[in-house]
């Protein structure tokens, strides 16, 4: 999967993840087409900073990335909160907090806490929690990780006009694409197909290139 972090004219990083670890292209070496293996702390420098509310948007890989960051940050003693403004899969009940007492108990056990409201149509999923409870939990946290987009489990997505669903409190956005989309046709791997065709000026049989994926990110 690939990530585009802190996009700006002055500072950006493109991160790739495989089973063996994280790899980074940065502004200083991207022209040489070199990558370097980095730790999760180096790949996502905001983890070494103060409190952040981070929204994850885009396509395949958001949940696994959130889990990796939550696991590492919890191991560093941080009170990590995972939630959603769209939908996420329901965690084990012992990690789901419905009130402040449960939240503190989960953190005291060294795990990250998850909050959300049960989705009526699918009991295995959570939707965005009640906003007052969400903001209370965020206030108590050291790091907040929000899944703020959906892609029907496809590796590629071009957002609709109403997407992603970002809270005003969120100060960092991480865009995600699954590298498994590379070399595959738009119709096979891209959510919001018509949006993707328009963005790339391509038909549904077009095979995604590195340049296409950069354009989408």
Give each language-model segment a name.
Residues 34-41:
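N-terminal pre-Walker A segment at the start of P-loop NTPase domains
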Residues 42-73:
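Walker A (P-loop) phosphate-binding motif
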């Amino acid at each position: 999967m690939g990530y585009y972090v802190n996009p700006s004219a002055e500072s950006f990083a493109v991160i790739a993840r495989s089973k063996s670890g994280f790899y980074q292209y940065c502004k200083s070496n991207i022209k040489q087409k070199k990558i370097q293996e980095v730790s999760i702390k180096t790949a996502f420098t905001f983890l070494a900073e103060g409190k952040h509310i981070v929204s994850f948007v885009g396509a395949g890989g958001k949940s696994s990335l959130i889990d990796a960051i939550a696991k590492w940050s919890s191991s560093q003693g941080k009170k990590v909160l995972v939630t959603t403004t769209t939908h996420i899969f329901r965690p084990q009940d012992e990690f789901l907090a419905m009130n402040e007492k449960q939240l503190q108990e989960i953190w005291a056990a060294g795990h990250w806490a998850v909050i959300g409201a049960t989705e009526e149509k699918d009991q295995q999923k959570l939707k965005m929690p009640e906003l007052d409870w969400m903001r209370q939990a965020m206030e108590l946290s050291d790091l907040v990780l929000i899944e703020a987009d959906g892609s029907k489990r496809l590796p590629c997505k071009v957002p609709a006009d109403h997407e992603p669903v970002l809270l005003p409190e969120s100060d960092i956005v991480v865009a995600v694409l699954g590298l498994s989309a590379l070399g595959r046709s738009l119709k096979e791997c891209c959510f919001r197909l018509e949006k993707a065709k328009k963005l790339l000026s391509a038909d549904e049989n077009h095979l995604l290139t590195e340049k296409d994926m950069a354009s989408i990110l």
